[in-house]
Each structure stands twice: as structure tokens, then as C-alpha cells.
Amino acid sequence: LLVQIDGLNLLTDPHWGQRASPFSFAGPKRHQAPGIPFDKLPAIDAVVISHNHWDHLDKDTVQALMTAHKGIRFYVPLGIQHWFKTEIKGSVLQGPAQNVVALDWGQQASLKGKTKKLDLHFLAVQHWSARSIGDRYETLWGSWALMHPDFKFWFSGDLAYSPDTQDIGKRMGGFDLAAIAIGAYEPRWFMKDSHINPSEALQVQKDVNAKAAIGIHWGTFDGMSDEPLDQAPKDLELAKKESSLEVNFVVLKHGQIWQK
């Protein structure tokens, strides 16, 4: 997502690669083109990364952003800064030129907007991390709350349903908009501890007290899970009809704009 708040341009888990995989010839392949061509991006001020899975952290994309956008800063879960140090040219982990900031759960950082300050909070959800067979849980994972006096936004990252989302709602006091993952949920016996389904996404919106929500994490890479690429929006609409919750939860086309 490209998030624009008070003159700031931020990206969430940017990925312009053709595969969500360590291999160029195998693994989940891109089905849907990015909503914005890379060369059409505005000047990017900051990037937030939710975790290090291959569909969320792409080396070529990160390097291209680091090279093309001077002054960019990456906010990452604790541990991922070491990946930046070894893999991404131009990474600075400390000092006045620092451009990679690692946060623990519950920590926050700030950016100066055009008129007011934007606070970035890194918040725990249930998921996991790994880039290879031997590094599971070595880095953190989580969600991001971008809190501005005029607009409050929550990016879920990947998550399973857990009490964490209720905690986020209580801690942060609610949001104007939440971007909530709705895809990669089948088969449930395998995915339920890692990914919510569309029905659970409705409950997550209620838990975090978001006035509006958009569904993300669907329809982009083929081979991530068992449901068809276009199934998540259909299941979300069905869940909305069956739910007793009154929700404002929509799915945008890739490249479509949501505006407050």
C-alpha cells in the first residue's frame, strides 16, 4: 500500500518482484501487476515492514527503493535490521544518517509531517517469521499503527486470530482506517494459526475499532494457498451478509484509491 498522510508518503511491505520466493524460477508467481508502476511512485519518505516472509520482504524491491529515494527510512521488526546490513547497500543502522530503524513490540518512532507529527507504533499480532529452514522466529513480526492527529491507520501485516487485536484496539483507541489481510487462508487446518479468513477479518475490524477497513493480502501471488485467487473478496461479501456486525469493509481493485 501507498499511504499518504500530511505530506508524507509511506509504503507497507512493498513488493515489485515477479515471485515471492528465494528462487527466480520457482515459487509463488505474480498474477497481478503492482497497483503503481515503480517509476511512477512519488518520493517515498518511509517504509514499514511487517515481517520477513518472501511475499512481504523482497530484496530487489528494497534495494531499488533505497537507491532511488534519497532520504528514505525503513522501519522494521527487531532483528530484520541485520538482514538490511548484509543484503541492502546503503543501509545505515545507527548515527545521524540512520535509515533502518528496528523496533520491538510496543515501541514507537516518529516522523515529521507537513503540519504535525506522525507516530509509528509496532504492535504484536500472532504470526511467525523465517527466510529459510533454520531461522524461524529469529526476527520479530507484527502490525503497524500510524497515528496522526488527523488520521489514524492500522496495517495488519499477516496474522492469525488472537487476543492481540483486542489489545490493539484498547491500547490505540481506534482507527479511521484499517488495512486487514483477507487472503491465504485455505486449508484452514493448516492456515488458521498463521492467517485469518474473511470472516475473522470482520471481527478484527471490530476488535481494533476501525471505522472503515480495506481487504489486503489477496489476489497477487499464485500458489500461496489453496483458495482461488479471486475467492477472498467473495468470501468477505458472504461473511458480511452472514454477520451481525455492522461494518464498513471493502475490497479495492489493485491501484484503486481510498480517501477519507
Give the residues covered by each predicted segment.
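Metallo-beta-lactamase
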Residues: 1-40, 76-157, 176-183, 235-256, ...
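Cap/insert and terminal regions of metallo-dependent hydrolase folds
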Residues: 38-40, 46, 73-75, 79-82, ...
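Glycine/Thr-rich phosphate-binding loops of Rossmann-like dinucleotide-binding domains
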Residues: 20, 57, 84, 130, ...
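Short, solvent-exposed loop/turn segments at secondary-structure junctions
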Residues: 1, 16-18, 54, 127, ...
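Histidine-anchored nucleotide/phosphate-binding helix
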Residues: 58-66, 201-202, 209-210
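Pre-active-site segment of Zn-dependent metallo-hydrolases
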Residues: 5-52, 60-67, 79, 130-136, ...
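Short active-site oxyanion
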Residues: 69-74, 152-153
